Amino acid sequence: MAGSNYSGSSSDEHVKVTSQRKQGFLERLGETTGGMLVGLMAFLLSFYLLFTNEGRCVTTQNTLDEGLSLVTSLNDVFTPLPQNDGKLVHLSGSLMTLQPLFDPNYGISLHVVKLQRRVEMYQWVEYDDSRDYEENGEKKTETRYSYNTEWKPEVVKSKSFDREIGHKNPSSMAVESFISVAADVNVGNFHLSKGLIDKINTFKKIRLAKFESPHADIVIQDDYFYHSVNHRNPEVGDLRVSFHFAGLSGEWSFLGRPDVVTIVARQKENQLIPYQTQSGNILQLLYEESLSAVEVFEKEHAANSMLTWALRFAGWLLMFVSIKLMTKIFHTLVDWIPGIRDLVSLGLTVFGLCVATSLTLLTVAMGWIFYRPLVALLLGILAAVPILIARSRHRPKML
């Protein structure tokens, strides 16, 4: 039966201890059985993740190789040539927007691709630190709760606090955050598609030294608009607002020169739209710097390689965890024997590492077998190494 008690010397920190009866053998066995089912589903999912990741990797490589072999670099971004219609083109140039983006509530008006208003509210935040221990045959959890006031961009729900009294937050913000996006964005005389505009996401904070406070009760300090009686000693519920931009465009302004971007996309008259490759993938690339066509595709290959290895590791980790869940029942059977349970736990961990590594390499090999047979063969040989090592360690010694 569970119970709890509190202790603490201040309103901003307290300790809560919960206790419950130690589970019996049959209860632990029942939980382990449920874990086996979850482990089985995760085990199957890891195979799917690993196999499809290899297919995605090869398809992306083929797409990038095809794109590099077909791309045409444009030297003049102000004169779209008819002979390039339908082709994959590469160009670099400064961003241009036809109309400024503005926030009339704060007097902000700028020629940028994206204008972001970020609102933060001064609120109570709860922190907890727990430790488990056993006492008089009961399993107990001691949780230390502490509270602090901080600026947060989202409403912190104080109703979920362990102790809301004295730490209550407002349920909403009087001013909301938002992002405004320019409808028409050009590089030279080329109009960017929505997909290309979405890729412009390097935000920079706007310095407010050249702006004035829109209202008497709003103070500008440290590049924030403060909705506060005393911004140096704020109260819970006070707001502060900052502005950020991405894709500076137009002529020279106090923010600096317009940003330069590099684009690889399909030319359709004076529009830049997605390019459909023979492999079925879409090419629509944008980098917020000046790059050659070769540099663009090198960066894409590097990103593809990084994603591939990240998903391989995720698949291996998922497989290892699933094997641990499925074999935990063996540990449960002996967890009441102090010495044996530690040895079994170590053995199951080593077993899980070996099997997960071997099956991961085999799955990767199967994913590559139709594309790179030699690589698949090498991976198959490597996959057998952990199993052979594990078997050699457990092979009975001959007298």
PLM regions: where:
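OB-fold and OB-like single-stranded nucleic-acid-recognition modules
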Residues: 2-397
